[in-house]
């Protein structure tokens, strides 16, 4: 199943707090990181391991380590930055690729203004992080970009997803797994997720949120 709605009690509890309109920027930012870490745990459960040895207190010990090249985390600017530290708290050695996409508020289409990808993507697991999967345009554009650069294993982590966005991603890229804390009702006329979290970028960075 390519869509994973993580219904762990901690995820449900933290997401419920994040839906509060009166939540402070500090709390929203911290909870974004915490939920991102929990999503990372789920998204990394089947990562390949390789045998290794280390020197322990009583001699050589056989252990296991993550096989292959380091993971790359791909935050979609700007809101994806709010989830980055949560992923890095579990995978501190991960490389970071940065993608800048802006959505045209009239057409709801995404256009790229920044692309900074790490090398050897064909040998890395790419974890895209973006709090909101709404229309799916930004996510599809990012996956397109990663695949053009050679990425073969891509997973998307998002706090809240709309069915419309999930469908758009899977129609374009059925091989990509989506991990989300919640599949919400759908999009309103402005393309925002309902009930959603509001504008995640504004809530993470403390900028003024537009209210329709």
UniProtKB/Swiss-Prot annotation:
Broad enzyme group: transferase
Pathway(s): Pyrimidine metabolism; UMP biosynthesis via salvage pathway; UMP from uracil: step 1/1
Enzyme Commission number(s) of this protein: 2.4.2.9
Catalytic activity from the UniProt record: UMP + diphosphate = 5-phospho-alpha-D-ribose 1-diphosphate + uracil
Binding site for uracil: 193, 198-200
Family: Belongs to the UPRTase family.
Protein name: Uracil phosphoribosyltransferase
Species annotation: Bordetella avium (strain 197N)
